[in-house]
Design a protein with these regions (language model features):
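Alpha-helical cap/lid subdomain in secreted, periplasmic
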Residues: 1-117
């Protein structure tokens, strides 16, 4: 029987990130946070389904294709909010990508990673 791991909740994520920031600052290190680069949810779904995986079952589990994007955006927004709340410098990577007219060329075929041009 496969072992199931408990996924961290958003509260867990915030707590862990805050703890890391405190530990770094306590050691005299100035942390810098960055927002997450955007993903292309449709490309990611296509990538997941490329080897015969059931698109219907994946969408049944997700609810809709864009849920992947929204979930990742929530984490990015949380990082930005915590940076503001803790006075931690923030690099707005997501915003830089979203401002790009050539955004599709910056995201790889898997929908998650950047192309060489994106890096």
């Amino acid at each position: 029987m496969p072992v199931r791991c408990r996924r961290p909740t958003m509260a867990d994520f915030k707590q862990i990130l805050l703890q890391m920031l405190r530990q770094l600052k306590d050691k005299g290190v100035q942390p810098v946070l960055m927002t997450l680069p955007p993903i292309d949810a449709q490309r990611y779904l296509d990538f997941l389904c490329r080897e015969g995986r059931s698109r219907e079952r994946i969408l049944d589990w997700l609810g809709d294709t864009q849920r992947i994007y929204r979930h990742q955006e929530l984490y990015s927004d949380t990082v930005a909010r915590l940076a503001y709340e803790t006075g931690t410098p923030l690099i707005g990577v997501r915003e830089m990508f979203l401002d790009e007219k050539r955004l599709p060329k910056l995201i790889a075929a898997d929908g998650i990673h950047m192309t060489m041009e994106g890096y």
